[in-house]
Amino acid sequence: MTTQNRHLSGKVAWVTGSSRGIGRVVADHLAGCGATVAVHGTTPTSARAFNEAESLAAVAEAIAAAHGTETLAVHGDLSREAEVKRAAAEIRARFGRIDILVNCAGGDIGAAGTGAADAGRPQRNDALNISPEDMQAVFDRNLMSCVWCCREVAPEMMARRAGHIVNFGSNAGLVGDEVGAMYATAKAAVTHYSRCLAAQLRRYNVAVNVVAPGTIVTARIIASNQVQPDRLNESGRLDRYGWPIEIARLVEFLVSDANTYITGQVLRIDGGEQLWPA
């Protein structure tokens, strides 16, 4: 059983893209803080990619068992509005509402999906040569999933005059880069959409912020051959890769009652990899 501070007790959190990777750790951490958590994957077996779990249901059950809180597994392609509405309806039918939305779903993953080479990264992955199919897949996975989920959840938060939305950007979305150009562009769009949404929702007391991670060690990142072994240092040094729990702690603050005056902001968490303004 968890020994964390249960300051999120009574809150219902939907963490998209939480069948594995950063999203799974965020969901687990929020549950440890007392939140009721809906975990999400594209399919019931999304968690099997990179051997992180047997099923989405198994992830939800493990989180519930670890922290003694209620969980629910929902699946769906969040780039499709109808599937977003269905997943949200399942959460509301079980828990009555959604207080917290964390949009972790995304990734530099093309049309072939995570089962392709390099963990699904598009093969011609630059601004001039990426295929139309891969480009659409990257934008759907990162931008449109975020837009549809925010549009679905924001109205009930506005009506209650309370709520927190955290969208996942990326350091890649704050700089130009030849490789992964469409992913960087999609994450830049997520960032600016979030600023626009924050401006619209602040009068309703709904906070919208962006977490922009640097390179965070997950099974997919390792499988995509992007990791330099000498930076896999878990000590207190900053010139290393980050770990999902470090992201989860930042999300915890942003969705808690301690956050009373932060909205529309991009919070880098990258160990100082980028030191210029967002």
Regions found by a protein language model. Name each.
Residues 51-52, 114-123, 182, 203, ...:
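A glycine/serine/threonine-rich, flexible loop-to-helix segment
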Residues 144-147, 203, 210, 230-262, ...:
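C-terminal helical subdomain
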Residues 2-4, 175, 252, 263-278:
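Short C-terminal tail/terminal secondary-structure segment
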